[in-house]
């Protein structure tokens, strides 16, 4: 039997903050399993989960509104530590007898709080000291409402001039509230506070580590599928690659990977995937060359959303056909990760407006009665990468920049043609190669080239040429929700432009995209 890595667990109730997933990732980084649930859970669900502690997230609502979200009352009766963050602190204060008022001024940004009373949450944690020796903490505030009276059995732990109750605590019940965000890096000691709560106050052991996660996943896969055969769509992306390696470790040759080469991949990507997984790691791979089929389906289509749907539909068709050729396959594996599960769950915190449709395997083949294997569904992307390293996958492959599911289908603007894809592949490879050579690749969050269906006059030797235009795009971001364009050196951009125009016959002009997100999106389509 493998160790129970879910034995100690934290429940995070989501009130809608943009930082809630970051809270969960921080808890996981501390080696402790946690799950993220909507705030309106039932007492029975909490009892069934049996958490070692509960965190109440921040949120955009006002606790002073009549129908604003509230924590289930059982949260405060379960006998486990509770940590309220921002809105989570406000609803805790209000529900336990304190008072919250709407503030005329939003407090947003850096603040320094002074610790005025001892608490297990911040004992020995400080960024600086006042003249009379009291600890100061540098924190990140983001709130409109504020607590104006704490519950009678709480004490004030820290305050600022504008926020008299920046930290409150009931040490006996192990209830804590902070009016700032410990999960963001701007709160310099935030990770230590979370560690103090999770590891010391909740007494959770660090059982959630890459090696133990792998052992647990392998055991669970074997228990789920036994000696049955499993099929997986392998794209060469991080999620499907790590899924393939976990399944291979668990069931060996009973796994068949289907690699669909849609003609929309990066330069030499198909060969690299086949070499690494087939030749090097010894996985059983079915290679399906399907470039003509995808490009035929895309012919004449200019609309980005329609292109995405065509690519998704054709992939499912091709995958289904290959699956039907295999005998006795009982299970379909997918690289679903935890954020996919969170996004697809019906959450009372509301849904973001759909900007672009997400590309994924469209479901099980209709003719096949297969079960679903999702070994990554509890993991965040950063955890998937760490597991990939532990399984022996190369760093460069696991940490390369994001690549959209539809591939070059949404990086060739307008109609997708083989000629355009071939030009774009070579131009993009030059851009990425130069970024690596200049030690800039890991300094930007994402970089790629876009093919513009526009011809431009150029000069080559004594002649004029009338060829295509490409745009370089590089951004810096923490969460991909917002992004700044990367200020790459002019001489570097000039070098990339010269190489592309001289080495890629058919491109006459290179431009650089200096749009931020918002108002632009990172991808052009």
Swiss-Prot record:
Binding site for ATP: 235-241
A Gene Ontology term for the protein's cellular component: cytosol
Coiled coil: none
Annotated ranges, domain Glutamine amidotransferase type-1: 9-207
Cited Gene3D superfamilies: 3.30.300.10, 3.40.50.880, HUPs
Annotated Pfam families: GATase (PF00117), GMP_synt_C (PF00958), NAD_synthase (PF02540)
Protein name: GMP synthase [glutamine-hydrolyzing]
